[in-house]
Amino acid sequence: EGFNIELAKQKERARASRVSNQSMNNQNEEYLNFKLKSTFIGYETLDASSQVIAIFKDGKQAESAKGVIQLVLDTTPFYAEMGGQIGDQGKLTIDGMNFDVINTMKLPNGQHLHIVDMKQTNIQVGDRVLVSVNYEFRKAICQNHSATHLLNEALRKVLGGHVLQQGSQVTNENLRFDFNHYENLTTKQILEIEKMVRDVIVQDYPVCIS
């Protein structure tokens, strides 16, 4: 009974997360109608000199703004939140002053939306900025992302090919992997799955993007 209660709670959390992101994108006409092109370069570099092509404040476009705002850049190395994986964090520099990029999300038409705390400094459309992804933060997310693939494979080998991913959450601190199975895992199965994943990790195989 306790297992079923926790399973129901997890399903509700996953549903709420999907609804939250979908509602932000699908219910805001400003986001839906924004069509300017933005290029992601985050697989080649973690730093860029970029131009601000749009500013959103409280869900509405603005020519200039300060405080916690959302920026779209013509080019960006920041990976956006998607598929249960959190977005990049980092720094934005303008006129020698540094500001925190606290999250990155994706707009309905594919552009990456940077949530930046500009404090009391005003920023305008057309401004040139330097942006830099937090390498350690990105690295930790990548490691947990890779771990979800290892876990998926181990689950299928131990439990059977019927196991399918039903959802996941990947952060810089941990991961959650949701899967279908017809009964609770035994202690023996859990230990076997953990060993399979750890055995691959200690091999320290190179990970390549193709």
Language-model features: locations:
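A glycine- and charged-residue-rich anion-binding loop/surface
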Residues: 1-210
